[in-house]
């Protein structure tokens, strides 16, 4: 059997995968033969297309249309990079409907009013790596800028419910909701938004992000560490631009702006260290003994190498397995 692969880094999505489904984690990151990538789903494609639209718009506003055409933020380039062909043009059409509402309701301008105050260059879609507590971490922030008080804001867009027949409601604790339909929540904060003056000069929610949506907190805290903040630091701002979609592609655009609790960050690092220890010790399934864990990995690898169609195992069928690859 070929030796296992070893990932160079852990990311928030990798940690979540290992905690949720060790089998899937093994097949994605450890198995000697990489599992074929799953096709991009419709919700993922709509989110990626929206992401392309907003980042193109921001770059055009900051640097001009002609300058943007020559960069990776050209719209055609972003869409090609982020959306798989089988999802187009449908995903882009839905994303355009949502993006128009994001602009019209004022959510985009609400964000850019803060971005334009940045004391440093605004960065989007960039890779950061850092070893924290012995764990090599990797992140890819959607948007990063500074406040006039030189505090960093780490921002991510989330499109929720774009292809759901029932739609979704925004996560609790948002600072402001905006839409083009004149709903009763338009222009208002969620009841769990507890305004607190932050060292950044911005108003944040005293109800920490890890208390409302822990995966968002995991993601943005990881980015903050990789950008140089110490574990437990709350001097940076975690911002989520959420587009919650109801039936008929009616979007409610809300902004979540808060911090991630110091103790929660330390527990997050503990989780990363546990995952990295599992990788380095080749003991992926912590609920099993080391021997049972290795055996489960061998079984998954063997199953991956088997042909999809096992009908040839019936009498008279030709069946070949590349045993040298096992």
List the predicted regions and their residue ranges.
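Non-catalytic protein-protein interaction segments used by genome-maintenance enzymes to assemble
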Residues: 126-219
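Short catalytic/ligand-binding loop motif for oxyanion handling, primarily in non-cytosolic enzymes
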Residues: 26-27, 35, 161-166, 246-250
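Hydrophobic/aromatic-lined pockets within catalytic cores
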Residues: 31, 54, 58-62, 145, ...
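Metal-dependent nuclease catalytic regions and adjoining charged, substrate-binding loops involved
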Residues: 10, 178-217, 222-326
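Nuclease catalytic cores
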Residues: 8, 12-63, 96, 124-125
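Short amphipathic alpha-helical segments and their helix-coil junctions
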Residues: 2-7, 23-36, 77, 154, ...
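Short, solvent-exposed loop/turn segments that connect beta-strands within catalytic domains
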Residues: 64-65, 132-134, 147-151, 231-234, ...
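A non-catalytic, helix-rich entry segment at domain boundaries
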Residues: 49-126
